[in-house]
Protein backbone atom coordinates (compact mmCIF):
# COMPACT_ATOMS: atom_id res chain seq x y z
CA UNK A 1 0.00 0.00 0.00
CA UNK A 2 1.35 3.43 -0.92
CA UNK A 3 2.54 5.68 1.88
CA UNK A 4 0.01 8.51 1.96
CA UNK A 5 1.00 10.05 5.28
CA UNK A 6 0.80 13.83 5.28
CA UNK A 7 4.08 15.65 5.72
CA UNK A 8 4.55 19.22 6.85
CA UNK A 9 6.03 21.55 4.23
CA UNK A 10 7.60 24.93 4.78
CA UNK A 11 5.57 27.76 3.21
CA UNK A 12 8.35 28.42 0.69
CA UNK A 13 9.37 24.82 0.03
CA UNK A 14 10.72 24.63 -3.51
CA UNK A 15 10.96 28.41 -3.83
CA UNK A 16 13.43 29.66 -1.23
CA UNK A 17 16.58 27.92 -2.50
CA UNK A 18 19.85 28.84 -0.73
CA UNK A 19 22.29 30.83 -2.83
CA UNK A 20 23.11 34.20 -4.39
CA UNK A 21 20.72 35.73 -6.90
CA UNK A 22 20.11 38.95 -8.79
CA UNK A 23 22.77 41.54 -9.50
CA UNK A 24 26.32 40.30 -9.09
CA UNK A 25 28.33 42.10 -6.43
CA UNK A 26 30.86 41.30 -3.75
CA UNK A 27 28.25 41.74 -1.05
CA UNK A 28 24.51 41.05 -1.42
CA UNK A 29 22.29 44.02 -0.72
CA UNK A 30 19.77 41.86 1.13
CA UNK A 31 20.01 38.59 3.03
CA UNK A 32 16.77 36.60 3.30
CA UNK A 33 16.06 33.84 5.81
CA UNK A 34 12.83 31.88 6.13
CA UNK A 35 12.03 30.94 9.72
CA UNK A 36 10.10 27.71 10.08
CA UNK A 37 11.01 26.95 13.70
CA UNK A 38 8.86 29.50 15.52
CA UNK A 39 5.80 28.87 17.67
CA UNK A 40 3.21 31.55 16.87
CA UNK A 41 -0.15 32.52 18.34
CA UNK A 42 -2.63 35.38 18.36
CA UNK A 43 -4.13 36.61 21.63
CA UNK A 44 -7.38 38.52 22.03
CA UNK A 45 -8.22 39.69 25.52
CA UNK A 46 -11.58 38.70 27.03
CA UNK A 47 -13.91 41.51 28.01
CA UNK A 48 -12.84 43.23 31.21
CA UNK A 49 -9.75 41.04 31.60
CA UNK A 50 -6.97 43.21 30.17
CA UNK A 51 -5.33 44.04 33.49
CA UNK A 52 -5.52 40.42 34.64
CA UNK A 53 -4.03 39.33 31.31
CA UNK A 54 -1.11 41.73 31.65
CA UNK A 55 -0.42 40.46 35.17
CA UNK A 56 -0.56 36.82 34.02
CA UNK A 57 1.89 37.45 31.15
CA UNK A 58 4.24 39.36 33.44
CA UNK A 59 4.22 36.54 36.00
CA UNK A 60 4.62 33.74 33.44
CA UNK A 61 7.13 35.33 31.05
CA UNK A 62 8.55 38.39 32.79
CA UNK A 63 7.17 40.56 29.98
CA UNK A 64 5.04 43.69 30.28
CA UNK A 65 2.46 43.70 27.48
CA UNK A 66 2.67 47.01 25.62
CA UNK A 67 -0.27 48.96 24.26
CA UNK A 68 0.06 50.10 20.67
CA UNK A 69 2.25 48.75 17.84
CA UNK A 70 5.30 47.81 19.91
CA UNK A 71 7.01 44.52 20.73
CA UNK A 72 8.05 43.38 24.20
CA UNK A 73 10.37 40.40 24.47
CA UNK A 74 12.49 38.37 26.87
CA UNK A 75 14.38 35.07 26.66
CA UNK A 76 13.19 34.26 23.13
CA UNK A 77 9.51 35.03 23.75
CA UNK A 78 7.84 38.13 22.31
CA UNK A 79 4.42 39.78 22.31
CA UNK A 80 3.68 42.30 19.53
CA UNK A 81 0.75 44.68 19.82
CA UNK A 82 -1.37 44.31 16.67
CA UNK A 83 -4.62 46.01 17.69
CA UNK A 84 -6.73 47.07 20.63
CA UNK A 85 -6.55 44.20 23.12
CA UNK A 86 -4.69 42.01 20.61
CA UNK A 87 -1.14 40.68 20.53
CA UNK A 88 0.89 38.32 18.37
CA UNK A 89 3.01 35.97 20.46
CA UNK A 90 6.13 34.20 19.21
CA UNK A 91 8.67 31.83 20.71
CA UNK A 92 11.42 29.64 19.43
CA UNK A 93 13.18 27.86 18.21
CA UNK A 94 12.13 24.44 19.51
CA UNK A 95 9.45 25.81 21.86
CA UNK A 96 6.97 23.12 20.84
CA UNK A 97 4.86 23.47 24.00
CA UNK A 98 4.65 27.26 23.87
CA UNK A 99 1.13 27.58 22.46
CA UNK A 100 -0.52 24.86 24.62
CA UNK A 101 1.24 26.34 27.64
CA UNK A 102 0.06 29.83 26.69
CA UNK A 103 -3.53 28.60 26.49
CA UNK A 104 -3.31 27.04 29.94
CA UNK A 105 -1.72 30.08 31.53
CA UNK A 106 -4.22 32.51 30.01
CA UNK A 107 -7.39 30.45 30.49
CA UNK A 108 -10.44 32.75 30.81
CA UNK A 109 -8.24 35.81 30.17
CA UNK A 110 -7.66 35.67 26.41
CA UNK A 111 -8.61 33.71 23.32
CA UNK A 112 -5.44 32.06 22.00
CA UNK A 113 -5.23 30.79 18.41
CA UNK A 114 -2.26 28.76 17.18
CA UNK A 115 -0.71 30.34 14.06
CA UNK A 116 2.49 28.28 13.90
CA UNK A 117 1.62 26.53 10.63
CA UNK A 118 -0.47 29.37 9.25
CA UNK A 119 2.20 31.99 8.54
CA UNK A 120 5.28 32.50 6.44
CA UNK A 121 8.01 34.29 8.38
CA UNK A 122 10.95 35.99 6.66
CA UNK A 123 13.89 37.79 8.24
CA UNK A 124 15.60 40.40 6.10
CA UNK A 125 18.83 42.28 6.65
CA UNK A 126 21.52 43.98 4.60
CA UNK A 127 22.66 47.41 3.45
CA UNK A 128 19.78 47.79 0.98
CA UNK A 129 16.99 46.18 2.98
CA UNK A 130 15.12 49.46 3.52
CA UNK A 131 15.36 50.26 -0.21
CA UNK A 132 13.82 46.90 -1.06
CA UNK A 133 11.00 47.22 1.46
CA UNK A 134 10.26 50.80 0.37
CA UNK A 135 9.29 49.48 -3.07
CA UNK A 136 6.11 47.96 -1.71
CA UNK A 137 5.46 48.89 1.91
CA UNK A 138 3.65 52.21 2.51
CA UNK A 139 5.24 52.63 5.94
CA UNK A 140 8.08 55.09 6.54
CA UNK A 141 10.90 52.79 7.66
CA UNK A 142 13.44 55.58 8.14
CA UNK A 143 15.19 55.08 11.50
CA UNK A 144 13.67 58.36 12.74
CA UNK A 145 10.20 56.89 12.40
CA UNK A 146 10.48 53.09 12.65
CA UNK A 147 12.80 51.74 15.29
CA UNK A 148 13.77 48.49 16.96
CA UNK A 149 10.67 47.08 18.64
CA UNK A 150 8.22 48.79 16.29
CA UNK A 151 5.63 46.69 14.47
CA UNK A 152 3.04 47.55 11.81
CA UNK A 153 0.24 45.74 10.01
CA UNK A 154 0.19 46.91 6.41
CA UNK A 155 0.10 45.83 2.77
CA UNK A 156 2.81 44.93 0.32
CA UNK A 157 1.74 44.30 -3.28
CA UNK A 158 -1.87 43.87 -2.03
CA UNK A 159 -0.71 41.23 0.48
CA UNK A 160 -1.46 41.76 4.15
CA UNK A 161 1.76 41.61 6.16
CA UNK A 162 3.06 42.28 9.63
CA UNK A 163 6.46 43.96 9.70
CA UNK A 164 8.65 44.24 12.77
CA UNK A 165 12.12 45.71 13.30
CA UNK A 166 14.11 43.23 15.37
CA UNK A 167 17.38 45.12 15.91
CA UNK A 168 19.40 48.17 14.94
CA UNK A 169 21.34 46.40 12.17
CA UNK A 170 18.53 46.61 11.01
CA UNK A 171 16.87 43.21 10.73
CA UNK A 172 13.22 43.22 9.71
CA UNK A 173 10.72 40.40 10.08
CA UNK A 174 7.94 40.03 7.52
CA UNK A 175 4.99 37.77 8.24
CA UNK A 176 2.04 36.85 6.02
CA UNK A 177 -0.54 34.10 5.71
CA UNK A 178 0.86 30.76 4.54
CA UNK A 179 -1.39 30.75 1.46
CA UNK A 180 0.18 34.02 0.25
CA UNK A 181 3.79 32.92 0.71
CA UNK A 182 4.42 32.41 -3.01
CA UNK A 183 3.08 35.84 -3.93
CA UNK A 184 5.11 37.53 -1.21
CA UNK A 185 8.25 35.68 -2.32
CA UNK A 186 7.72 36.72 -5.93
CA UNK A 187 7.43 40.39 -4.97
CA UNK A 188 10.38 40.26 -2.59
CA UNK A 189 12.83 38.56 -4.95
CA UNK A 190 11.93 40.82 -7.87
CA UNK A 191 12.33 43.88 -5.66
CA UNK A 192 15.68 42.71 -4.30
CA UNK A 193 17.16 41.55 -7.61
CA UNK A 194 18.70 44.90 -8.57
CA UNK A 195 20.72 44.96 -5.34
CA UNK A 196 21.59 41.27 -5.32
CA UNK A 197 20.25 39.01 -2.57
CA UNK A 198 21.29 35.89 -0.73
CA UNK A 199 18.95 33.22 0.60
CA UNK A 200 20.34 31.48 3.68
Locate predicted features.
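Basic, glycine/lysine-rich polyanion-binding surfaces/domains
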Residues: 1-200
Amino acid sequence: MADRALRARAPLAGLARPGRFGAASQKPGVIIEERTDLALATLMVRRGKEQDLKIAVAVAYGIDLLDGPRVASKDGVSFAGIGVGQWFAAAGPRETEFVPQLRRRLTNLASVADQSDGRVVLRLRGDRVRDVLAKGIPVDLHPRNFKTGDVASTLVAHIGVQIEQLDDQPTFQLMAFHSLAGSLWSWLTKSAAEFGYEVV
